[in-house]
């Protein structure tokens, strides 16, 4: 696996032409990827909180949040394997945080076996709050992680370029 550090990273809302690339990334990154129909629905319902990261014209990452009545829910985040460990996921989360109401709960679920992701989220200030048994279609448990969005400016996005 190649690790690429990217000093400037264009992050922008998903566009109609991005859905196929997001679906390809879903299939590459997840055992049980979301369907193209579901990705399209997410894009329509969350147009301002479905962000994509682009490197040299290629979509290399995305993150999407649903705004709920009492919390923000990270539905999915993915980075192409060749672009991991370069700060893309951290920058996507930071860019999302800037768009979300401060002082609210930010929640996600992650596979219990996905220890690198759990460590990443811990590093972003998330704490494990509970386990949901049999959450995933293959029967694997999910770890629920949460944190409050800071009322002051969030994670550093100085090296992000939002379009």
What are these regions (language model features)?
Residues 7-22:
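A short beta-loop-alpha structural element at the N-terminal edge
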Residues 52, 58-66, 71-78:
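Conserved beta-strand in the GNAT
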Residues 93, 100-112:
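Conserved GNAT acetyl-CoA-binding A-motif
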Residues 77-84, 110-113:
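A short, internal acetyl-CoA/4′-phosphopantetheine-binding micro-motif in the GNAT/acyltransferase core
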Residues 1-4, 141-163:
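Terminal substrate-recognition subdomain of acyl/acetyltransferases
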Residues 107-109, 122, 127-143, 163:
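Conserved catalytic-core motifs of GNAT/GCN5-like acyltransferases
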Residues 89, 93, 114-117, 134-139:
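Short glycine/proline-centered loop/turn elements that form peptide/ligand docking sites
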Residues 79, 85-98, 119-123:
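Conserved acetyl-CoA-binding loop-helix of GNAT-fold acetyltransferases
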